[in-house]
Amino acid sequence: MSQRTLTQFLIEQQRKEAALPAQLRLLVEIVARACKTISHCVNKGALGGMLGNLTSENVQGEVQKKLDVIANEKLLEANEWGGHLAAMASEEMETIHLIPNRYPKGEYLLLFDPIDGSSNIDVDLSVGTIFSVLTAPEDVSGRAVTEADFLQPGRKQVAAGYAIYGPQTLLILSVGTGVYEFALDREMGSWVLTNERIRIPSGNREFAINMSNMRHWAPPVRRYIDECLAGTTGPREANFNMRWTASMVADIHRILKRGGIFMYPWDAREPDRAGKLRLMYEANPMGFLIEQAGGMAFDGNHRILDIEPKALHQRVGVVMGDRDEVKRVVQYHHDANLAKQTA
C-alpha cells in the first residue's frame, strides 16, 4: 500500500461531504512547511549557532532562547504572504502581527507557540511547535484586524496541531475529524501519514505534573496526586508512575499515544494568576486535540474550550488527558467548592 502524504490527506478531507475549505487546506500545508524548516534548525543545534539565550525577554517575562526567536520569524515569514490569513499572534510577541499590505488578506487567524519546552533545547530533549487556527470575523475584510478578533473560545477552532522535534519529527493534526499523525520523511521531504484517528488509551496509570510545586497546589490537586502516590495501599489500589519533561508537547504526545493525565494547575505562588500555561497558544490547541482523541480538557472546574478569553496572553490551569482521570480531578474540585459553600 502506498504511503499517504499530508497533501494527499488534506485533499481527501477537502473532497468529503463536510469539505475542508481550500484556503484552510493550503494554510495547514504552509504551517507544516514552516515546521519542517524549524525542524532543520533544531537538528543543526550548536553547529548552526541555534543554542543559547538572548538578552531579551518575551511578553511573558521569560528570557528568550535563540531558537524561540528564529522559529517565530520562520512562522511569520512562511505564513504572511499566502493570502490565507487575516493576522497572526505568537506567544513571543506582545501584540498581533498584521498581514503586510503588499499581500492579500484571507479569512483565518493563526496563533502559535513557536518553540514549546524551550528550556530543553540546550540539553537536547524534545521540543515542539503548537498552532491553532480560528476563523476571522466576517467584517475584517473591510477593516484592520484587532486583538479582540482573536478572543474566541477554543471550541471555535477549525484546526489545531503541533510538531514535535524528537528522535523523529512528527506532526499531530486535527481539522475536526479526528487526530492524525504524520512523520517527516527527510529523504522525500514530505510529511507521511503514520497513524490515523488516534484515541487516548484508557486505564494507563501515569501522570505528568511538576512535583516540585506540590506544596503550592490547591487541595483537590494535592488529594489526587496523594492518592496516586499511595499506590496499591491507597484508595486507588494501583501503582502510578510520574512522567515530566517540562515540554507540554512531549508530555501530551505521550498521553495521546499511551494514556494518562497531564496537569499544570493553579498554585499559590501567584494566587491572582489562573495558571502558568497560555490559553490561546497552548491550552486551547492541545485541548482541541485531546478532545478529538476522546479525552477531556479542563482547568479544574471548567471545560477549557468553553473559556471566553479576555486577553491574548491569558493564562489558565490545565488538567487534560484520559476522560476518567480528568473527571476524577474535576470531581475533587467540585467537592472542595461544595465544602467551602457549606462551611
Swiss-Prot record:
Belongs to the FBPase class 1 family. The keyword Cytoplasm applies. GO terms for biological process: fructose 1,6-bisphosphate metabolic process; fructose 6-phosphate metabolic process; fructose metabolic process; gluconeogenesis; sucrose biosynthetic process. Pathway: Carbohydrate biosynthesis; gluconeogenesis. Keywords: Carbohydrate metabolism, Cytoplasm, Hydrolase, Magnesium, Metal-binding. Homotetramer. Substrate binds at D116, G117, S118, S119, N210, K276. This is Fructose-1,6-bisphosphatase class 1. Its cofactor is Mg(2+). It is found in: Cytoplasm. Its EC number is 3.1.3.11. Mg(2+) 2 binds at D113, D116, E282. It is an enzyme of class 3 (hydrolase). Binds 2 magnesium ions per subunit. GO terms for molecular function: fructose 1,6-bisphosphate 1-phosphatase activity; magnesium ion binding. It catalyses: beta-D-fructose 1,6-bisphosphate + H2O = beta-D-fructose 6-phosphate + phosphate. It comes from the Bacteria. Disulfide bonds: none annotated. InterPro entries: FBPase_C_dom, FBPase_class-1, FBPase_N, FBPtase. Mg(2+) 1 binds at E91, D113, I115. Gene3D superfamilies: 3.40.190.80, Fructose-1,6-Bisphosphatase, subunit A, domain 1. GO terms for cellular component: cytosol.
